[in-house]
Amino acid sequence: MNKYRENETLKIVQEYVDKTYQGHYVGDDQDKTQTLDLLESIGTVSDFCQSNIIKYAARFGKKNGKNKQDLLKVMHYAILLYHFSKFDNDH
């Protein structure tokens, strides 16, 4: 058990991420191109992720009822940035 309940928070983040993919891009596998894939192909995906991290972090506390959602988006874009930075290949 972590002092700050990181394990529980990571489970919540995982549930959020899973839900984001359930509602998008329905169809066969070849039709599931995401904006992130296009941005990666032109070399701007990291900038996009960083911009969204800044946007949602800056918005935190300013939209009633959206604080949790904003933080989940920050964490999701941080995970994506980690992936696109190739750190997950450093095992």
Regions picked out by a protein language model, each given a short descriptive name:
Residues M1-H91:
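Intrinsically disordered, low-complexity regulatory regions
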